[in-house]
């Protein structure tokens, strides 16, 4: 019997999930519940928040270290991102308030084509929520590296890690290439070290922090 939706997950299924991973010594770093937290439709946005809050209630039962989401499903332009930002702030505040009630952790993932798109907006979110214990981050360098910043990665990664490093619960490691036109349309995944991401600064930070 599978799991069809968030509304009908049982404690028995959560225990099966936890024990199955534990038996093979596999940690559940992120219990994913990726939702559109900035949907302009208030009803859909409320349902997305409710889904994340429901999964936060299962975090400990499932053995997850945090519950994670991005802030949209869509590839948004700058105007669309700005228009959705207040909805995103409100959604995340409600989610973190729910996390605090069960001592869970919500980890949000910045993406440059989503409303949580930059260091400046992340700082605004941190200030708005003001709960370092229950608001953490998933850091995916590939999702915050815009074409114009490719030559400036050492500073970029140091800036990101200075801001959110103490709250990073997971780092996604991958690589990609841009085509000759340097546009998003020519993005292509590739093996680590074969693309444009320079991991030296991130690797150095990980060793300095003694992070797993």
Question: Residue locations for each model-derived region?
Answer:
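Glycine-rich, proline-tolerant flexible connector loops at the mouths of alpha/beta enzymes
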Residues: 1-18, 72-76
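A short acidic, helix-capping loop that chelates divalent metal ions and anchors anionic groups
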Residues: 2-4, 37-41, 75-80, 145-148, ...
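Catalytic-core regions built around general acid/base machinery
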Residues: 9-24, 88-98, 159-160, 201-205
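Short, acidic/polar
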Residues: 17, 46-57, 150-161
């Amino acid at each position: 019997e599978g799991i069809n939706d968030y509304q009908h997950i049982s404690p028995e299924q959560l225990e099966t999930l936890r024990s199955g991973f534990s038996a093979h010594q596999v940690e559940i770093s992120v219990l994913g519940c990726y939702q559109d937290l900035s949907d302009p439709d208030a009803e859909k946005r409320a349902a997305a928040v409710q889904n994340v809050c429901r999964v936060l209630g299962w975090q400990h039962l499932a053995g997850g270290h945090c519950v994670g989401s991005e802030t949209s499903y869509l590839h948004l332009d700058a105007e669309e991102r700005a228009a959705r930002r207040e909805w995103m702030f409100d959604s995340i505040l409600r989610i973190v308030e729910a996390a605090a009630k069960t001592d869970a952790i919500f980890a949000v993932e910045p993406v440059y084509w989503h409303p949580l798109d930059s260091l400046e907006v992340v700082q605004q979110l941190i200030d708005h929520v003001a709960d370092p214990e229950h608001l953490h981050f998933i850091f995916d360098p590939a999702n915050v590296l815009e074409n114009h910043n490719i030559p400036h990665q050492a500073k970029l990664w140091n800036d990101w890690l200075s801001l959110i490093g103490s709250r990073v619960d997971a780092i996604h490691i991958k690589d990609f290439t841009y085509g000759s036109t340097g546009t998003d349309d020519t993005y292509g995944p590739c093996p680590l070290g074969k693309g444009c991401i320079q991991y030296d600064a991130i690797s150095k930070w990980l060793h300095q922090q003694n992070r797993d």
